[in-house]
């Protein structure tokens, strides 16, 4: 286990009241959060989203990505379902950090795509460690999920880490003229499954 569960509190939101559960990485002290809605106990697979931190999309309403749109849509789907989990994975910018993400944006402004920009900065296309999320699910007592994602790699990594992904639920929202090239690159170079938007 790479994490420990350290704190929890109620979190009222426009979608209803969630239980916010805080986790701490044992090796680094970095924190991550789960939002739990309804009763997630029992054998029925839980609707879940692993959402990687994106300050620009989630809090600053950036149109460069689909992250903020996905966050809102995931919370809506979970609330409509009546039960579910959103893991807020604190690995900003596909885990290159906020300042390097800004540097990557500057390279994208010069014509590089999102993958090329990461490579120019000396990073892989995606530096995230999703095995932490498998530990969060386990600490919440969940071993089977219906995962809201367009990223088959995320499904593969969580499955290898012992989480039973019984269904991949597409979450295709937020495409606009400012992020179309970014989304096309994620599909072409990173294998994301992006069809028509909702």
UniProtKB/Swiss-Prot annotation:
Gene Ontology MF: a single term: GTP binding
Subunit relationships: Homodimer.
Residues forming the catalytic site: 126 (proton acceptor), 128 (nucleophile)
UniProt organism field: Escherichia fergusonii (strain ATCC 35469 / DSM 13698 / CCUG 18766 / IAM 14443 / JCM 21226 / LMG 7866 / NBRC 102419 / NCTC 12128 / CDC 0568-73)
Top-level taxonomic group: Bacteria
Residues involved in Zn(2+) binding: 54, 65, 67
KW Disulfide bond (keyword) present: no
Keyword GTP-binding: yes
Record-level GO cellular component terms: cytosol
UniProt protein name: GTP cyclohydrolase-2
Function text: Catalyzes the conversion of GTP to 2,5-diamino-6-ribosylamino-4(3H)-pyrimidinone 5'-phosphate (DARP), formate and pyrophosphate.
Annotated signal peptide: none
NCBIfam families the record matches: PRK00393.1, ribA
Cofactor note: Binds 1 zinc ion per subunit.
GO biological process terms held by the UniProt record: riboflavin biosynthetic process
HAMAP family attached to this UniProt entry: RibA (MF_00179)
Catalytic activities: GTP + 4 H2O = 2,5-diamino-6-hydroxy-4-(5-phosphoribosylamino)-pyrimidine + formate + 2 phosphate + 3 H(+)
Protein's pathway: Cofactor biosynthesis; riboflavin biosynthesis; 5-amino-6-(D-ribitylamino)uracil from GTP: step 1/4
Protein EC: 3.5.4.25
